[in-house]
Amino acid sequence: ALDGLVFQSKVRAVGVSNFRPWDVELLQGSMQTRLVTNQIEVSLAAIQPFTNGDLAFHQRRRDPVMAWSPLGGGSLMTGHGPVAAELDALAAEFGVDRAAVAVAFLLRHPATILPVMGTNSLARIARIADAEKVRLDRVQWFRLYQAALGQEVP
């Protein structure tokens, strides 16, 4: 069915949502066209794809990953604790808000993570777009990552 959509020029390419690596491989094995993306939940509030192999799988395939809920359903904007403290510190350092730092964290990862933002507010979109101004170095990136993991990275 997905191949048919591409062959009939109804779509240029197809991807999937919430597939684990073995699901992508299983479906891909029965297709003639290439799956080009997988939309998964990944953020500083949903860190599992960094540790369970999902991002590594797509990075190896050179497939961009679409990140749904990249702001943790808003929890990263209103939450407290270690992640919020790191977001606030970096937001102050770069002169942006938490959302820009949270998105910059995803953009800095080499797996090519494409955040899917769920807002229609132009002001909110502008604040999120400030992620392009945030150039996290490795130390800053790992501070956020460790805060999200709740432990130091060896």
Residue ranges and their predicted role:
Residues 1-154:
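Beta/alpha (TIM)-barrel catalytic core signal, keyed to glycine-rich beta->alpha loops juxtaposed to Asp/Glu
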